Amino acid sequence: MPARTAPARVPALASPAGSLPDHVRRRLKDLERDGLTEKECVKEKLNLLHEFLQTEIKSQLCDLETKLHKEELSEEGYLAKVKTLLNKDLCLENGTLSLTQKANGCPANGSRPTWKAEMADSNRSPRSRPKPRGPRRSKSDSETMIEASSSSVATRRTTRQTTITSHFKGPAKRKPKEDSEKGNANESAAEERDQDKKRRVAGTESRASRAGESVEKPERVRPGTQLCQEEQGEQEDDRRPRRQTRELASRRKSREDPDREARPGTHLDVDDDDEKDKRSSRPRSQPRDLATKRRPKEEVEQITPEPPEGKDEDEREEKRRKTTRKKPEPLSIPVQSRVERKASQGKASAIPKLNPPQCPECGQYLDDPDLKYQQHPVDAVDEPQMLTNEALSVFDSNSSWFETYDSSPMHKFTFFSVYCSRGHLCPVDTGLIEKNVELYFSGVAKAIHEENPSVEGGVNGKNLGPINQWWISGFDGGEKALIGFSTAFAEYFLMEPSPEYAPIFGLMQEKIYISKIVVEFLQSNPDAVYEDLINKIETTVPPSAINVNRFTEDSLLRHAQFVVSQVESYDDAKDDDETPIFLSPCMRSLIHLAGVSLGQRRATRRTVINSAKVKRKGPTKATTTKLVYQIFDTFFSEQIEKDDKEDKENTMKRRRCGVCEVCQQPECGKCKACKDMVKFGGTGRSKQACLKRRCPNLAVKEADEDEEADDDIPELPSPKKLHQGKKKKQNKDRISWLGEPVKIEENRTYYWKVSIDEETLEVGDCVSVIPDDPSKPLYLARVTALWEDKNGQMFHAHWFCAGTDTVLGATSDPLELFLVGECENMQLSYIHSKVKVIYRGPSPNWAMEGGMDPEAMLPGAEDGKTYFYQFWYSQDYARFESPPKTQPAEDNKHKFCLSCIRLAELRQKEMPKVLEQLEEVDGRVYCSSITKNGVVYRLGDSVYLPPEAFTFNIKMASPMKRSKRDPVNENPVPRDTYRKYSDYIKGSNLDAPEPYRIGRIKEIYCGKKKGGKVNEADIKIRLYKFYRPENTHKSIQATYHADINLLYWSDEEAVVDFSDVQGRCTVEYGEDLLESIQDYSQGGPDRFYFLEAYNSKTKSFEDPPNHARSPGNKGKGKGKGKGKGKPQVSEPKEPEAAIKLPKLRTLDVFSGCGGLTEGFHQAGISETLWAIEMWEPAAQAFRLNNPGTTVFTEDCNVLLKLVMAGEVTNSLGQRLPQKGDVEMLCGGPPCQGFSGMNRFNSRTYSKFKNSLVVSFLSYCDYYRPRFFLLENVRNFVSFRRSMVLKLTLRCLVRMGYQCTFGVLQAGQYGVAQTRRRAIILAAAPGEKLPLFPEPLHVFAPRACQLSVVVDDKKFVSNITRLSSGPFRTITMRDTMSDLPEIQNGASAPEISYKWRATVLVPEAAARVALPAHPQGPYPQVHERAGGCRMRHIPLSPGSDWRDLPNIQVRLRDGVITNKLRYTFHDTKNGCSSTGALRGVCSCAEGKTCDPASRQFNTLIPWCLPHTGNRHNHWAGLYGRLEWDGFFSTTVTNPEPMGKQGRVLHPEQHRVVSVRECARSQGFPDTYRLFGNILDRHRQVGNAVPPPLAKAIGLEIKLCLLASAQESASAAVKGKEETTTED
């Protein structure tokens, strides 16, 4: 049976022109009304027309075809003769069917006609086969030639010209019975519409045939190469015969056999005059395409033409039912159910889009324009014959060991191509061999010793294989990988591919070299993040051998599966105590982003990339002081053993997913874990899983669990109480008072001593109380009072807190107690026994004892009843502070309780009080001053109020809420917008709260109680309202170029409760200032000014009235000065003016480019004399901005070791700081080294002991600075179940430092980004422990979850401004709207401002004094697809990759992108409104991933819809920033597909520049960076935002001022006492 061919799309049947009689014409029309199916109608028409073809013409056509096959007639001559015959007897009257196409010949995605494929068994080509594969029937060359000729079709890629008679061969196929019945049932109903449709199609074809007659002459090309679309402009005489011939051929073929299927590679549009005529020619000496023996006889079923636009969808559906046959076994997925047409709307029903056909062997799409066919070399022979050629022999007959056949022969192989059994060129590295798909190759074999890759001296071979395995044998000592194939007969080292196969093989070489880059990069950078890996890939110059200009992120994502597999293979050879490098942060991101399948079988590749293990560069072993070392090796050892035991018990359960191939493998029986198993003769004690069966999926999951803490903190109670259980009453029978009563007060008789069971107890002693629950430890308390009343013999207990009840948990010293603010009255009978609690204060020489052997806290305390305490512990905020120095008065010693006094002071402080009364009018008492929380408020003061305290007469313009998203219209251009199921956009300020309302106090009054006393609980304030710019009728646009502290006076008044007042601020009339507005704004916190008044009735701005000025201005000009009338300004400055504060000598460890130092300098508290930074570019940037600082670029461990050894200078002669020199120590030690492990076992503990955190704590212990600050990522407080936090605080407490921790949001301190940072503050004994700074700006609530959960207890910082703040949020517009427009990749060092920005915030005032050019923009360069994607991201807020259109785009280098194919049903997202599929991989259907489904060079990255369902649809990737929003956390390399996500400029098609990132961090434009673009990005991304550092510095400054004031007061008091004594 001849092979079936692909019919052209069947047009309305054309009859021969004038040669047919009228009755025949009528009969042709009647056939269309006889109720026949479409196929039957076509068959009858063909039979009718065949009667009018003259016999001699048929004979002549057959003779011409025979001559063409025998090459006695050229193709040009054949076409000319056929044209003559056809023009003589046949004339086509309908023309060619016109079909629209895209530039590459592929219909738009979703608009493809219905495809169905039916696969039939085909005979294989003759060849010698290895025995395991089994014999196959061979065909003669004549049979093959007949099949090739009978199945030839006009195509772009075949090498033979289509013949005419071949279209009339073969019987017509009958339609299945069920289809025929359905067709008959619907035929009569659609009869009239079919007739109208045929007439319209015929007219269209006629017009198209007249307009599209341009076919180029056949062009001679290399066999097997892809032919591009032909150009217009050849001679008309040469084009017309060929076009007419092809039209007739397609029509005759359609009439003869409409069911014939397309051959692979056949383009299925009839109107392809500009493409199909280009055929591959060959020299006459070259044999015909022998690969056709392997090509399928049937691969694609008949294609139904798509009606012209405007046709009824019902017609298309009916046509498809008539002409489409059902395939017995679909190649891909079941077709989705059709969408029913709504009768009320009268619209067409949505037609589901079916899959394009695929090759059943290699899985490639048959309509892919890049699909190529194999062309064998000239005179090629099969493999056995080739191997016997003498040219391949390296031995002669005299060789004594010639006849040994222990191993397969090895040869070099060049000019090779690899193809499947159907002749499609295909890669070998996509898993086809692993799936037992037979792949063959052809080319030129050479002897193993040959080095010349040319074809000279080689033996041409064809159909070698099938390939049993392919392998990589490392590299050739340079950049080229050695790759080979193994067959049943020999092994072949590959040299150079054929020109046709070079693009495919180039990708294979590219992925191998990228794997080499990744493995070598991870060897030295195991803690690198994804952006660092992309930086490495993009900055590596590709070797010339692989013909790639540059590596990109798309290159890495394209080969991600292969790269991860190679990294896994590298990890297979690791030592047991080594951490797998595939668990590094960058590899986990790559695995998630690209959807890599872990644990796949890799046995088919004999060897992997052999990269020599390189000793990882990094910090040396941690240099620790003895105190720090003792903490880790003594107090934590028991916890380590406990965790190790838990690990061993749970390893077997945690190491299996049961799905991947690694888990399903049997135990190897050879590794250390297997040898310990009982079944392999071991003891079975270790209970470890086989090292070869450790599931990679679970390993990645466990590593991800600690990657980032969740934003949503569970609702847990704050540990404000000890939650002591019920106490157990003791049987104390003998309780008696000793001595006389001390005092009698309120029915209480106080005593000083008591005897309990012959044990004397007096006030001030400590006792233990047994809990009712025996599993709990003893409760300990200090007896502060003893008395007797009606309740019996009582005592007042001031409780101690055990270390395990603090944030320290199990890391605390078991003998250490902490004072807390809790006390209780109890009966003496509850006392268990007397204990001893010693206060251990700091030694007089504490600061100089650093680094020495630590003394025992309680030498000889082994009786179980002796404890010690150093600090007061605040359970609300986890603050360890020195105990208060309050001394009891002489008359209060018998009942003096520190807890009661502190609580009373706190209540007294929080209670509102009236200080000065003015008058009483109508039952109201008017006042001039009141106080609350230690702040005094007077008439004329300005105050903060919550946003709900009062409203404005102008209706507030609420933040613009985005309208509800309309249904996604996927008809014009398919997009993935449907994935945006949530309206939340990361980086949006839509939910940001309003800042405080501000008012000036006009009156203060309150009512009276019944007794005539002032009712201080009901104080009211009448005030004038201040408008902010956004509160006026100009709304938010008024803030674009206005200072953030600008207000407008208003005569509107409001009355508020004093309890609503949130604090005091300063508001001045700008014209009354004695300094510039900028100096005034920077002169202190909470400063505002106004220049105009706002009239809400007229919506106009006016001059402020006289009473708007501060009351103190009445004295202006009389020598009183400005300060007298404005006490709120002068009061905070008085202590600072009176006390000169020296700056702290600071050592900045891990300084980076100097963000912390810059903030502290702005706060005016420090002078950074030393800095340590190992990374040279950051160290150079620090030097540029701090020329007076000694910057060490050495390992911090080396420097500390030198100092501890008594060295004064380092190897470079730089002077080292000595003990006593450092007054403040600050830094942010990296902690990635132990961030990837889920449990704290002995291996991770060992790594933690050598981490930089331990080194930093040793610096603190040695130098003993006055203040200590540790900054780190927010997750620092959660690492290892908060164990890192606990150990850090434990070390500080053991050193004697007061300390606390908290999480701060940098966006609340004046930067346009969300950046949560963990801060640990510590103060030396005698200093005041700083509070955390109150927020200055409102910020998005989602980003302000700052609680920390430790051991199921929630801790918060001392911050009280939780719902609002003094200033509005800083936006992207504030940050960078004045910067000039720059292009992608611009690198000019200086660019002029677009316009000069005003002072937006006090922290950014440095912009005003800038030169005309800010330091370079330096945006990241993104070429090819990345830059093109940026240009297609819409400018609307919230846009990201899901808004990319699925279109073809020409890149700058001329390459045209492919459209992304959606060929699978997505079970989660369903189908589109048009019925189109939404899945890009078989995993969307719940199956395993198919590597053949991967797509490349698409505008929409294939990996994103592939893995989107598992990762929140990758929201934000390729995301555009919003002018009124903020940055995500600024990272070290802004990549559109990186962690930060939204990095595209709001209006320009590029990522944000270095200067824009620096501004988002709060760096002034005068701050200089060093190095290339990526170095600068890294410097900015790793820095602490200077505004945040400044806010912390100001809090430290307040502590210094308070200490200075106390010292001054003590000195004055001492002087007065001395004077009195004198």
From Swiss-Prot:
Sequence repeats lie at residues 1114-1115, 1116-1117, 1118-1119, 1120-1121, 1122-1123, 1124-1125, 1126-1127. S-adenosyl-L-methionine binds at S1151, G1155, L1156, E1173, M1174, D1195, C1196, N1582, V1584. Residues 149-166 have a biased composition (Low complexity). PROSITE patterns: BAH (PS51038), C5_MTASE_1 (PS00094), C5_MTASE_2 (PS00095), DMAP1_BIND (PS51912), SAM_MT_C5 (PS51679), ZF_CXXC (PS51058). Residues 176-197, 207-222, 237-269, 276-300 have a biased composition (Basic and acidic residues). Homodimer. Forms a stable complex with E2F1, BB1 and HDAC1. Forms a complex with DMAP1 and HDAC2, with direct interaction. Interacts with the PRC2/EED-EZH2 complex. Probably part of a corepressor complex containing ZNF304, TRIM28, SETDB1 and DNMT1. Interacts with UHRF1; promoting its recruitment to hemimethylated DNA. Interacts with USP7, promoting its deubiquitination. Interacts with PCNA. Interacts with MBD2 and MBD3. Interacts with DNMT3A and DNMT3B. Interacts with UBC9. Interacts with CSNK1D. Interacts with HDAC1. Interacts with BAZ2A/TIP5. Interacts with SIRT7. InterPro entries: BAH_dom, BAH_sf, C5-Methyltransferase, C5_DNA_meth_AS, C5_MeTfrase, C5_meth_CS, Cytosine_MeTrfase1_RFD, DMAP1-bd. Residues 100-360, 702-733, 1099-1138 are annotated as: Disordered. The modification Phosphoserine is found at S15, S138, S140, S149, S151, S400, S515, S555, S718, S736, S882, S1436. It comes from Rattus norvegicus. Residues 16-109 form the DMAP1-binding domain. Residues 126-137, 720-731, 1115-1125 have a biased composition (Basic residues). Methylates CpG residues. Preferentially methylates hemimethylated DNA. Associates with DNA replication sites in S phase maintaining the methylation pattern in the newly synthesized strand, that is essential for epigenetic inheritance. Associates with chromatin during G2 and M phases to maintain DNA methylation independently of replication. It is responsible for maintaining methylation patterns established in development. DNA methylation is coordinated with methylation of histones. Mediates transcriptional repression by direct binding to HDAC2. Sumoylated; sumoylation increases activity. Acetylation on multiple lysines, mainly by KAT2B/PCAF, regulates cell cycle G(2)/M transition. Deacetylation of Lys-1116 and Lys-1354 by SIRT1 increases methyltransferase activity. It catalyses: a 2'-deoxycytidine in DNA + S-adenosyl-L-methionine = a 5-methyl-2'-deoxycytidine in DNA + S-adenosyl-L-homocysteine + H(+). Residues 146-213 are annotated as: Interaction with DNMT3B. Zn(2+) 1 binds at C657, C660, C663, C695. SMART domains: BAH, DMAP_binding. The record marks S515 as: Important for activity. This is DNA (cytosine-5)-methyltransferase 1. Residues 1144-1603 form the SAM-dependent MTase C5-type domain. Its main location: nucleus. The modification N6-methyllysine is found at K139. The modification N6-acetyllysine is found at K169, K372, K753, K895, K961, K980, K1116, K1118, K1120, K1122, K1124, K1126, K1354. Residues 1-342, 304-610, 1126-1622 are annotated as: Interaction with the PRC2/EED-EZH2 complex. It is found in: Nucleus.
